[in-house]
Amino acid sequence: MGFGQVVIGPPGSGKTVYCNGMSQFLQSIGRKVSIINLDPSNENIPYEPAVNIQELIDFQTVVNETDLGPNGGLIFCMEYLEKNLDWLKEKLLPLKDHYIIFDCPGQVELYTHYKIISNILDNIMKWSFRLTVIQVFDSFYCKNPSNFISILLVSLSGMVRIELPHINVLSKMDLIEQNGPLDFNLDFYTDVLDLKYLDAFLDKDPRLKKYSKLNKAIAGVIEDFSLVSFIPLNIMDKKSVANLIASIDKSNGYIYGSLDTNTAILEIQERETQWNFDKYQETQEKYYKSYEDDDVIFENDQDEDYDEFSKYLNR
């Protein structure tokens, strides 16, 4: 049984940086990790992929020979992979004892309008891999209410169309207030609290006023499903990464892979309860310059707390 992550999200959200950083962190705590590059247009790969779709099909050749644009060429490449899954299976099966990270393309339509990625993942699951989909979004989108609603809609669409455990991530948390303070506390964005509070901010901007009814209708759909939430992440902060890994391991079952007795499950549940107490309070205090308690100061390196996570992650 293999375990891993499928990393998706819009262009510029930091997927490849996430894959590279996550791989380094997991290797540092003793896991064997392999990254699978499924993005045929990814020209600057900072890691050494164990499997690379570019060995199967060349994106630039497709674009030149078919006269397709970038998006059309990418869809062509992914459809070609879907028709040649035996190639992928042959590459993946020897890696079952590795923790697998799939670096996927950033074109949103692959997840919202096509079944290509979903079909590929369905087949990978049949090969005895247990996966969690990680949707990565730039925390910059929290700054604008309309942009925030758009990533909520993309998140919901991906969760509905790809039938796997999902975790949505707000990346680049260290830069979240680079363009000014946010309108709400962090938990409003991570837990997707009452979106009606966004109405006043949507009506403020004259450019968005004509879309006010549309935005409110979309917000209503998101609240009706009540599926979307986010985990904040700074990939350079080991405590932040460890928090995310704890959630991922629970969602795909990795956390239970080494259990010998039923009592160990109770120990894990107790530990999860302790970790989830005010789980994002520290992140808010650390990265929100406008946070109301200005006297609270946290050091970047919290080795004592991190050791507790390491004990769990090395199980």
Swiss-Prot record:
Molecular function terms from GO: GTP binding; GTPase activity
InterPro entries according to UniProt: Gpn (IPR004130), Gpn2 (IPR030231), P-loop_NTPase (IPR027417)
UniProt motif (Gly-Pro-Asn (GPN)-loop) ranges: 69-71
Keyword Hydrolase part of the UniProt annotation: yes
Coiled-coil positions: none
Highest rank taxon of the organism: Eukaryota
Gene3D superfamilies recorded: P-loop containing nucleotide triphosphate hydrolases
Entry keywords, A to Z: GTP-binding, Hydrolase, Nucleotide-binding
Binding site for GTP: 12-17, 171-174
Site (Stabilizes the phosphate intermediate): 71
Entry keyword Cell cycle: no
Alphabetical list of SUPFAM superfamilies matching this protein: P-loop containing nucleoside triphosphate hydrolases
Record's subunit section: Heterodimers with gpn1 or gpn3. Binds to RNA polymerase II (RNAPII).
The protein's role, per its UniProt record: Small GTPase required for proper localization of RNA polymerase II and III (RNAPII and RNAPIII). May act at an RNAP assembly step prior to nuclear import.
Sequence similarity: Belongs to the GPN-loop GTPase family.
Protein name per the record: GPN-loop GTPase 2 homolog
Naturally occurring in which organism (per UniProt): Dictyostelium discoideum (Social amoeba)
